[in-house]
Amino acid sequence: MEIAGAQTGIQAYGDAESEALTEEIALNDFLEANDIEPVETDLGEYILQISGQPPSHIIGPAVHMTKDEISDLFERHHGGPRLEEASDLVAAARKILRQQYLAADVGITGANFLVAETGSAITVTNEGNAELTQGLPRTHIVIASLEKVVPTMEDAFTLLRLLARSATGQEFTSYTTVMTGPKRAVDLDGPAHFHVVLLDNGRSQMLGNEFREMLRCIRCGACMNHCPVYVATGGHAYGWVYPGPMGSVLTPQLIGIENGFPLPNASTFCGRCEQVCPVRIPLPKLMRHWREEQFRRQLT
């Protein structure tokens, strides 16, 4: 954030995986330690931020909370009369967040895909929060992991169709935005400064081992929705950023099997996760590899 010189930061995410990246590197903690206020702008993430809870799903981060719990939370945090209707809760959050957008020095988004052909970053949302975050503050920072890079725009839009259909059952999300650099002299709006942070954080090591197929993951969350273990336990039981079958494979790679060794055992090997995966990642096979590694190291 030194390059931005920000006093107030707004964070928005192109998808929940992008939000997960900032959790992976503890970005919010770093910003707060440097007197920069981060504000989540995805509605689910905003709810979790003011409640002090971690997300439980990579697409619907607050799916574990009921409407009544959110009503209680807004009443405590915002004051005023208790709001009972979902539309009223959304309107209250919109009113508060709109002021944060206008006050922000820096907008931080993720990217669902980065296009090598054009140097573009693509975000998809159903709330429009990423679009406001990249367009209103004077500086826009994109944070994305290296497996988000695809060769061409055609490749990106093929994957975007898979992502929307597997994540929310839509043909396309409500907002799909392609960003290619800061605004030009002739542009009336857009950020004056544009930066892309490409995060490795152990992923390049996966290219040379048996878990490289995990890098195909587009973070749709379908594997979680069909996993009997995830449905029974919820996302918080997985203990770190990434829940469900994809987390059971990815987490041991990122934080070490010695820290994440229980996760590959959180599976019935029913195969549903592989069946619904739009990019056909063999998740049961990869969890079995981790179990073999756990046995080899005698981790119990």
Report each predicted region and the residues it spans.
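Ferredoxin-type iron-sulfur electron-transfer modules in oxidoreductases and energy-metabolism complexes
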Residues: 187-214, 229-300
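Short, glycine/acidic-rich beta->alpha junctions
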Residues: 19, 219, 268-271
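Phosphate-binding glycine-rich loops and their immediate beta-loop-alpha structural context
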Residues: 217, 221-224
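Acidic/polar loop patches that form or flank catalytic/metal-binding clefts of enzymes
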Residues: 151-153, 167-172, 225, 232, ...
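Short glycine- and Lys/Arg-enriched binding-loop motifs that mark or flank ligand-binding interfaces
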Residues: 115, 217, 267
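Residue-level detector of anion-binding/catalytic polar loops
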Residues: 37, 223, 273
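The feature marks the mature, well-folded catalytic cores of soluble enzymes
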Residues: 1-210
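Short alpha-helical basic/polar micro-motif
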Residues: 117, 225, 275
